[in-house]
Structures are given as C-alpha cells and as structure tokens.
Amino acid sequence: MNNLRVIMSVLLAVLVFTATVSESAEEMGKGEVTISLRCKTKTECLKNIACEACVDCRCDKGICKCHGFTAETNNPTV
C-alpha cells in the first residue's frame, strides 16, 4: 500500500511539473526579446529588452536609444 502512495505522488508531481514547464515554454515563445542594443530599423528597437519601459525608442547610428520613459510622461518631474 505504501508503494501505491509513492507511485501516485510521484505521478502527480511529474504531471504538475510537466504542466508548469509547458506553460512557461508557451509564454517564452510569445514574443521575441532582443538583448543586443544594435539595430538597423526602429522595429528592432521595439523588441529590445532595454526599450520595454521607453516611450520613444529610436535606432540612432545603429544603436537603440531611449528618448523618454513611461514614468516621465505620467509624472513629469519638471
């Protein structure tokens, strides 16, 4: 009887682990995130992780640069 409990708990743990991993894999595949700051077009900057909080991210001379953050537009400090 003890073996049955162990088998059932291991099976349940494997099912929960599999469901969690597959859900995480789906979320990771939703959008591509670029870590490099190099760019050729503005759309490459929009996928960049450094420009997530940026309101106006531009590709200046091959490098993504932020020209304004969300916090600055919502709560101006000046």
Swiss-Prot record:
Main location: secreted
GO biological process, one term: defense response to fungus
Disulfide bonds: C39-C59, C45-C64, C51-C66
Compartments reported by the entry: Secreted
One GO CC annotation: extracellular region
Signal peptide start and end residues: 1-24
Keyword Signal: yes
Keywords: Antimicrobial, Disulfide bond, Fungicide, Plant defense, Secreted, Signal
Family per record: Belongs to the DEFL family.
Protein name per UniProt: Defensin-like protein 287
